[in-house]
């Protein structure tokens, strides 16, 4: 299915930090008024345990305002993106990841039954909440290989057994091509399983990859083509990734091209996330630039992380949150008037 370059994209905003429904009505109204058609609610393990009815109420408010509800498993099990702590990690150390030296890591291994059960329970709550899309956001292992330390994950007993079943030998301690392929395959298999479980509950899926993940174009296309995947994207957060202003256009354009290529011939729409957190003073205009690059590159769904420039989280707040948020609104407004 060809993607339309320059057409007006769908716009979305991530929303977290508030569980007061009355306050959310004002916040979500602001999001709707700025031209967004969907809102991505974070739903953590704390929400699963303490706020399931509250999440339903929040989502109902957004639906009344015309916002399609997405939910994302915020830091669930330490496997997906987010800053929330994990009850499951604390309660099930035996199910956690191990690095190649045998060290315990603060995240569940996706191969462990504890992780699978946690996802099932989360998806049950997501389906009951009234959400339409589950965003599988930045799936990752707690220790990604780096040359300096030589450490990587996961080499727990479940991963060792899985490797042995296919390779007919022990999982190596040292990183090599075969280990890299196994790690990438493990994450891909996890995402496939999550998408299938979501589909069984009538939920669509959005897959969002880290910018430092695998460059396997074939693997990307296979994930985007999975039944039930409605969006496929990435989080090319340029400031977070250390890119100077002069490199931002090329970096974003390259990412957009890869996402468009991955979704070509599939039912999934390319999705790009715009960084609106940790923006240094003087670089706010890059948000407008980023939205425009994505729009003209054929990204048909553009979302921003997050509402009010993450000002509720001081560790991620920009130098000028109000200016960043105003710039987001200007960038969203520009998509209504500018055509390629």
Which role does the model predict for each range below?
Residues 78-102, 137-171:
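Aromatic- and acidic-residue-enriched segments that line the glycan-binding/catalytic groove
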Residues 144, 194-197, 201-248, 278-297:
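Substrate-binding cleft/loops of secretory-pathway carbohydrate-active enzymes
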Residues 131, 236-237, 241-243, 268-339:
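Substrate-binding cleft of secreted/luminal carbohydrate-active enzymes
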Residues 68-129, 173, 192:
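Active-site-adjacent "subsite" loops/lids of carbohydrate-active enzymes
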Residues 12-19, 40-49, 101-120, 173-188, ...:
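The substrate-binding groove and active-site-proximal loops of carbohydrate-active enzymes
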Residues 27-91, 175-199:
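Aromatic-lined substrate-binding rim segments of carbohydrate-active enzymes
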Residues 7-18, 70-74, 134-139, 175-217, ...:
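Aromatic-lined carbohydrate-recognition surfaces of secreted/lumenal glycan-active proteins
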Residues 17-48, 128-133, 227-232, 293-302:
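Catalytic domains of carbohydrate-active enzymes, especially glycoside hydrolases
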